[in-house]
Amino acid sequence: MTRTRPAPSSTAAARRRHVLLFPLPYQGHITPMFRLAGILHARGFAVTVFHTQFNAPDTSRHPEYRFVAVPDGLSGPAPVAVNDVVARILALNGACEAAFRERLKGVLEEYSGEDDVACCLIADVHMLSMVEVAKQLGVPKLTLRTGNAACFTVFLAYPMLCEKGYLPVQGMSLDPV
């Protein structure tokens, strides 16, 4: 994607702050991340969104952002079937880590000699590997948790529900469509 750049300036104060985002590729995580991107962009930040191939955002809806695709190893002509959401998130983290490291290094190198400066990575709290990569590369990092209070309560109750045998649900089948 081609970006329009402001005229170069010799002062560090004129450097454009650039925020890097990496949402978990589920709608309940993508939407809040893009809302945050909109707020940051309105306050003068340039925005780069890293995204997986799985459930990739429609880049034409956000022409003001730069998008960097990260191969996830779970999409494509022969996607890996992972029915357990937690297992899928863990698989996604593992599959994206090396490719994200490569792409993040590329973005950082691109901005090292320009008027843009990458100030931080904001990753979904479930994208643990991406946070670790940012840490290893010296990029300040923040995490965004998109769940609400009810979701937090479920997370707290999950171990107890497993201990009592309520989860995972046994003997349940879906009606054929």
Question: Residues of each region from the PLM?
Answer:
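Nucleotide-sugar-dependent glycosyltransferase catalytic domains
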Residues: 1-177
